[in-house]
Amino acid sequence: MGLMDLVKKAFLGATDEENRKNKEKMRAIFNESVPNGNDYKLIYCHMENFSNAVIVENTKHSNFIVGYKEGEVVVIPVNPDLLDYGKAIIFNKKNESATRTSMGYCIVSNPEISFQFVPITYEPALAGKGKYSVAVTQSSAEVSEFKNFFKKGL
């Protein structure tokens, strides 16, 4: 890893090589989990849930591959190194799902389950979150398109 890669890793959360490899892994996971996976646009989302006890603060980090196309959203929970992942959860009108945005969060839900997450452009390793997030960078345009999709609704 050269000096420029170290700088990118520190400030953007991913080197160009990590970004490329992780986006390929995300696509492979998605295509393995969802029929016709290439029909969906993909984005990485992260969520932190905080809980406070009297003395201890606990933070739970969650990572998701989110695929979306007109009328449907698919959420796949993943771990930060993309080695383990959960079952694909499909949201569409048939299962009474809805999407919305609120205070920077994207929310998808149906009567049985709901997810709230944040699509991120990058997660700086300097912030200490590198070990909890997938090392990937996404453009502001990608994130904006995703948020607009959620605002519009299914």
Q: What are these model-predicted stretches?
A:
Residues P111, F115-F117, G128, Y132:
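Non-catalytic effector/regulatory segments
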Residues M1-G2, V78, S144, N148:
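Coil-to-alpha-helix initiation sites in intrinsically disordered, low-complexity, charged segments
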Residues G2-V66:
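Anionic N-terminal interaction surfaces
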Residues L126-L154:
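Terminal and domain-flanking low-complexity segments
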Residues A53-S114, T121-E123, F149, L154:
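Phosphoinositide-binding peripheral membrane targeting modules
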